[in-house]
Amino acid sequence: MLLLNASGCLDALTAPDIARSLDAFVTKTITPLPREGNTPPRIAETAHGMLNAIGLANPGRERFLHDHLPRLRELGIPLWVSVGGFCASDYADTCAALEDIEAIELNLSCPNVDEAADSAAEIVAACRRATSLPLYAKLSAAHADIAAVARAVAAAGADGLSLINTLRGLALDLRTLQPVLARGTGGLSGPSLKPVALAAVHACYAATQLPIVGMGGVATGQDTLELVACGARHVALGTVLFSDPGAPSRIRAELAEVDVEEFVAAAHDSEKLLEFRAKVVA
């Protein structure tokens, strides 16, 4: 099992020690052209997590490839690059330009990208033709039938899934009766997302049996094992990294007495899972 960061929740160049405490680092989503993102304020705390409306702020493909990626490689960390865009060719062209990395995560929840099963499959198929690198499709549980989207991207050539992206939410300032975020709504993340993530991972693993990076409200070793029990092969940390940068090391310590690889194998085999649970109870 790999422990990763959720895209956009950690800057490896400014916090290399935290990045090195993970098994692999996932970059912010890269788009063909630079994006400044949304007007501040674009982050707001909630009772059980946070909202963000960053707007895919990033340096753009060319600067990332020629400036950021070489510096990330110097850190000696296995790299996953998150790729975004607004049409299939945006994704495919960036994928074609990437090499010497561990995997590509396709952010299929970008603004203005229709995440219907056929659109997601079209993007994955275009990227599959453009690269031989492993492709992980990142999906949002906001879709009416996330398992159907998972099946579609699997058929189109995805090697794995990243589940889940944020859900749309709203925070209000009662003094002004205006949204806290300048954009209005934002992506909800944090502990409140975990039950949704568990359900999505369970449904998509049952539908595809693809390797899954589970994420959404992970803050403890128990959270990690719950996602694995639902079918995740790897786990990513997101919002917790803002409040507890030492979370990767702490979670590893919490899992020290568990044979995680045995648990992963058991979670993918119902009979073994029952045996493993019996051992835990004993």
Regions found by a protein language model. Give the residues of each.
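Catalytic cores of alpha/beta
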Residues: 14-19, 89-100, 143-156, 202-208, ...
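Alpha/beta catalytic cores of nucleotide-metabolism and tRNA/nucleoside-modifying enzymes
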Residues: 188-212, 219-282
